[in-house]
Amino acid sequence: MIRILVSNDDGVNAPGIKALTEALAEIATVMTVAPDRNCSGASNSLTLTNPLRINRLDNGYISVHGTPTDCVHLAIRELCDGEPDMVVSGINAGANMGDDTLYSGTVAAAMEGRFLGFPAVAISLNGKALKHYHSAAVYARRIVQGLLAHPIASDQILNINVPDLPLDEIKGIRVTRLGARHKAEGIVRTQDPAGREIFWLGPPGVEQDASEGTDFHAIAHGYVSITPLTVDLTAYRQLSVLQDWVDKI
């Protein structure tokens, strides 16, 4: 039987991870290990200065007082009964497109799975007042089945974004590149009840590159977006340019 490790960054009680676990349980043995709270924006952070405490829940899930990356690392290295065949992260409440991927704990959980040597997928549902986790779960299951049957290169994860639409209104799947956003909106400056100064980070910037071929464009036109991501951040096309620059200094 196929074994799949499921995690997320919205927390172990989020509706997305429940929908994902139930959908994947139809094709695999699923182990669900996720943060005990919302860790959105945690990126690839690890907890190195405190112990990781876990709680085994009545529904079989395991919550971890740690980040999404902690969850996947701990699950694979210690908690899983045998290695998983795949790591699937999500379903995130909100898209992870363009620059979002740099900050996303959802994407980071998948990246950690790939870093440890396993095929990995991150899946997110675009929108705010989300209604259609079932649509995202169905596409997640379909894509996971395809990935198991036809593996991709070992240095990649698949970043999937699904429009918040009924299943029969989604037009299909498009392979995309990452788009881009304008810089984030301003900081909100205010005071807490005790009169102390506090700050809230503003919402993400609007789309800057949402042209055809991007994840933003696919979602806006009712398609599921799949973008292959690599862990290697090296800007290979700039190596020779940088070498020329170094030779001049």
From Swiss-Prot:
UniProt keyword Transcription present: no
Pfam families membership: SurE
Keywords, in A-Z order: Cytoplasm, Hydrolase, Metal-binding, Nucleotide-binding
Gene Ontology CC, one term: cytoplasm
Subcellular location per the Swiss-Prot or TrEMBL entry: Cytoplasm
Residues the entry annotates as binding a divalent metal cation: D9, D10, S40, N92
InterPro entries xref list: SurE, SurE-like_Pase/nucleotidase, SurE-like_sf
Cofactor note: Binds 1 divalent metal cation per subunit.
Enzyme Commission numbers on file: 3.1.3.5
Cofactor(s) listed in the protein's UniProt record: a divalent metal cation
Main location as per UniProt: cytoplasm
Top-level class of the enzyme under EC nomenclature: hydrolase
SUPFAM superfamilies given in the database record: SurE-like
Catalytic activity, as annotated: a ribonucleoside 5'-phosphate + H2O = a ribonucleoside + phosphate
Function: Nucleotidase that shows phosphatase activity on nucleoside 5'-monophosphates.
UniProt record similarity statement: Belongs to the SurE nucleotidase family.
Name the record gives this protein: 5'-nucleotidase SurE
Gene: surE
